[in-house]
A protein has these predicted regions:
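Glycine- and charge-enriched low-complexity intrinsically disordered segments
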Residues: 150-161
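Stable alpha-helical elements in mature extracytoplasmic
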Residues: 42, 46-49, 69-70, 74
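Catalytic cysteine-centered active-site loop
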Residues: 56-107
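Recognition helices and adjacent regulatory flanks at domain boundaries
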Residues: 47-51, 57-58
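Bacterial Sec signal peptide processing site at the extreme N-terminus
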Residues: 18-42
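...with weaker cross-activation on analogous glycine-rich loops/strands in unrelated enzymes
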Residues: 36, 85-147
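Sec-dependent bacterial lipoprotein signal peptides
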Residues: 1-24
């Protein structure tokens, strides 16, 4: 066997072993990548998810097309489209990854809002201006971050991949 091919195969096996050990040892509050996704693919995957879920009704605690809440939609999107395991709740999702400014938003960044004294909301940035989320009034929709309501309630943005 060609030594270059053998060397690459050894690096892949070693890398997979390291990833497996790291995933088992990782704290539960971090996102765990099943496979990395390129940024250009993220936007396409998000639009695929949006098209499949568009209009799905909001249901607190929901995790299906019969009804889904905001953190459930984020959880399912990351799992099914991006191959990453995120925490299930908005609060726990808000504690993972790295903070980014709204001006630095990229497709796949999580955007968090404080919509009431003890109420949080989460969506996924499609770009610097729009995000997809499970809205209580409209179900799964794309909204503008330029909207006054979303600008006033924006709490933070986080990059988890």
């Amino acid at each position: 066997m060609n030594s270059v091919i053998l060397s690459r195969a050894c690096r892949v096996v070693l890398g997979l072993g390291i990833l497996l050990v790291a995933a088992c040892a990782a704290p539960p509050k971090s996102a765990q990548a099943v496979h990395p996704v390129e940024t250009t693919t993220v936007e396409s995957a998000l639009y695929d998810q949006y098209q499949a879920w568009q209009g799905t009704a909001y249901r607190y605690g929901g995790m299906s097309k019969a009804g889904v809440d905001c953190s459930g939609f984020v959880y399912l999107t990351y799992r099914d489209q991006l191959g990453m395991q995120l925490p299930r709740t908005t609060l726990h999702q808000s504690r993972i990854g790295q903070a980014v400014s709204p001006q630095q938003l990229q497709a796949g960044d999580l955007v968090f809002f404080l919509t009431g004294p003890n109420t949080r909301h989460v969506g996924i940035a499609l770009d610097k201006h729009r995000f997809v989320h499970a809205s209580k009034s409209k179900g799964v929709v794309v909204s503008s971050l330029a909207n006054d309501y979303w600008q006033q309630t924006l709490w933070q943005a986080r990059r988890v991949y």
